[in-house]
């Protein structure tokens, strides 16, 4: 299985730090299961994760699930296994607390899904707005995005941590940020890309709406008033934001 771990890591385009992280987590997985994958061994491994914090468990589960899928795809495993996080964040918690989603900025097999998630999380955009984003809407000199909607224009500052993922997409051919043969993708495509990315990160409970809510919570924490936040979101009235300011 050690060779399988090395082959799996080599098959992914990872930074040096990510390679080390994957190797450490999968070597730990190998030691616990003894190189044999079955339901009992996986249950034992999952039980061993109880001592780690939620974010660390999610990272380890994500690495192991990707590895298990790799083994299944190659025919090494005859049965498909997938581990689930047992301690889920409840919907109520998600709506009231800012989540640690730093793993969204790490390597992924779903770069389009990651960019969609980060555009929602960092700028509060809706999937419909993302689908219509033109590369000309971005000014990379001043790091701003201009959006016109319903005769309302808003200027959004692009966060530094978003830029590396965004610039990569802006350098590709085409007028739209996301397009296929010159046409925007369907709503289902955006949904599927985001879902695949969230599943990879073991954040299956999240949706585009809840990611946008994370943007709202962060902006409120940063001192934005209800009126200022409504302008950032392109809302005609701040009424729908009242529940976050009670």
Swiss-Prot record:
Primary location recorded for the protein, binned into one broad class: cytoplasm
Keyword Heme: no
GO annotation, biological process: DNA transposition
Tyr recombinase domain ranges (all copies): 84-246
Residue numbers annotated as active site: 149, 212, 244
Protein keywords: Cytoplasm, DNA integration, DNA recombination, DNA-binding
GO molecular function, one term: DNA binding
Core-binding (CB) domain residues: 1-72
Intracellular or extracellular location(s): Cytoplasm
Family: Belongs to the 'phage' integrase family. XerD-like subfamily.
Function, in words: Putative tyrosine recombinase. Not involved in the cutting and rejoining of the recombining DNA molecules on dif(SL) site.
Record-given protein name: Tyrosine recombinase XerD-like
């Amino acid at each position: 299985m050690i060779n399988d771990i090395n082959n799996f890591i080599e098959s992914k385009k990872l930074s040096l730090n990510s390679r080390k992280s994957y190797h450490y987590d999968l070597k730990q997985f190998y030691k616990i299961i003894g190189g044999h994958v079955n339901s009992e061994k996986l249950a034992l491994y999952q039980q061993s994760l109880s001592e780690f914090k939620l974010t660390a468990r999610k990272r380890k589960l994500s690495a192991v699930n990707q590895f298990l899928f790799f083994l299944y795809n190659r025919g090494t495993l005859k049965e498909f296994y997938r581990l689930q996080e047992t301690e889920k964040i409840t919907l109520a918690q998600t709506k009231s607390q800012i989540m640690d989603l730093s793993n969204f900025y790490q390597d992924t097999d779903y770069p389009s899904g990651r960019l969609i998630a980060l555009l929602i999380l960092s700028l509060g955009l809706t999937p419909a707005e993302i689908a219509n984003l033109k590369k000309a809407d971005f000014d990379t000199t001043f790091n701003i995005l201009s959006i016109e909607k319903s005769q309302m224009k808003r200027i959004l500052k692009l966060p530094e941590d978003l830029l590396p993922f965004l610039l990569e997409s802006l350098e590709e051919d085409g007028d739209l940020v996301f397009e296929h043969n010159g046409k925007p993708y369907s709503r289902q495509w955006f949904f599927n890309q985001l879902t695949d990315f969230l599943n990879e990160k073991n954040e299956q409970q999240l949706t585009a709406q809840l990611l946008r809510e994370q943007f709202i919570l962060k902006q409120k924490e940063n001192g934005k008033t209800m009126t200022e936040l409504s302008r950032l979101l392109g809302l005609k009235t701040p009424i729908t934001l009242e529940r976050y300011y009670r």
